[in-house]
């Protein structure tokens, strides 16, 4: 998986690796000028001022204390630091009770419904039974789009009329999932741009609906579009404040020239990237491999 993931990412991250240009930079003598240039290049890769500042503060301390003396020592140190940053969030394990319930949160246009469909198809291919819930009752044709994915994944679908209460959809989906004894219930949600108070209330209501059935929510995924850069960072910050996130599904990483934004997203959301989209095909939604990603972004 790591090799395929690395190859899938390497092409898409060419602009990021070119912006970093570490091969040439780290062949020069290690001094303050080189460290300043490295800091500038990390910022150009969209790793974010706060993250880069913390990273460079640690590197400068290593340099001043002479723990790092040569430029050739910087790349291994940098790889270790970036890998640790991506692994800071806990990976959760699903409960043994059925159905395993997964929520998908995020604003409109980031690929939420597509992510539900692709992950559902993967689960179906592994022999699991599925139910999809069309919790986005506000977007025109949202249920129809999810029905298309349900057909492809071999999943059943619970949906209500357009403009209905999302929590009512969740309620009926929980009832159906338990009665039909399906393995997984995947819940698509509305992606309107909310204010924080309304978003918190809507999320809390849906989560309470699940709890009233005596069920446990195993995953709350935040779906983000890597190509939107700082907008995705702000979304990560907002949703982390209103929902108990368990992981990030990152779409359109193949089309983003700013691959460094991943580090900001993990920092703001406080959870790890779990899946990443590197293309349009169903099989292009991959398990996120932190080591392969760091190797790809620092490729010389």
Model-identified regions with their sequence ranges:
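Non-catalytic terminal/linker segments enriched in charged/polar, low-complexity residues
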Residues: 1-104, 119-121, 125-132, 152, ...
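P-loop/Walker A NTP-binding module and the surrounding RecA-like catalytic core of P-loop NTPases
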Residues: 83, 92-300
């Amino acid at each position: 998986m790591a090799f395929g993931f690395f190859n899938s990412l390497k092409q898409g991250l060419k602009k990021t690796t070119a912006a970093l240009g570490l091969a040439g930079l780290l062949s020069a003598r290690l001094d303050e000028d080189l460290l300043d240039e490295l800091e500038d290049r990390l910022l150009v890769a969209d790793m974010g001022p706060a993250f880069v500042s913390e990273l460079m503060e640690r590197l400068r301390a290593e340099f001043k204390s002479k723990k790092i003396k040569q430029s050739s020592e910087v790349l291994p140190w940098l790889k270790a630091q970036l890998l640790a940053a991506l692994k800071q969030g806990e990976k959760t394990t699903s409960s043994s009770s059925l159905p395993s319930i997964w929520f998908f949160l995020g604003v409109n246009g980031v690929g939420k419904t597509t992510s539900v469909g692709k992950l559902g198809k993967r689960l179906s291919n592994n022999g699991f039974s599925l139910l999809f819930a069309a919790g986005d009752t506000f977007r025109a044709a949202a249920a129809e789009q999810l029905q298309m994915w349900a057909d492809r994944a071999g999943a059943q679908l619970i949906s209500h009329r357009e403009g209905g209460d999302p929590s009512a959809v969740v309620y009926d989906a929980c009832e159906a999932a338990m009665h039909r004894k399906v393995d997984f219930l995947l819940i698509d949600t509305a992606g309107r741009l909310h204010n924080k108070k309304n978003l918190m209330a809507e999320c809390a209501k849906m989560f309470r609906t699940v709890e009233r059935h005596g069920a446990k929510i195993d995953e709350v995924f935040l779906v983000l579009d890597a190509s939107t850069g700082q907008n995705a960072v702000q979304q990560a910050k907002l949703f982390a404040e209103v929902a108990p996130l368990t992981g990030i599904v990152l779409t359109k990483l193949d089309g983003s020239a700013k691959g460094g934004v991943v580090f900001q997203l993990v920092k703001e959301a406080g959870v790890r990237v779990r899946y990443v989209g590197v293309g349009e095909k169903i099989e292009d939604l991959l398990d996120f491999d932190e080591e392969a990603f760091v190797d790809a972004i620092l490729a010389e």
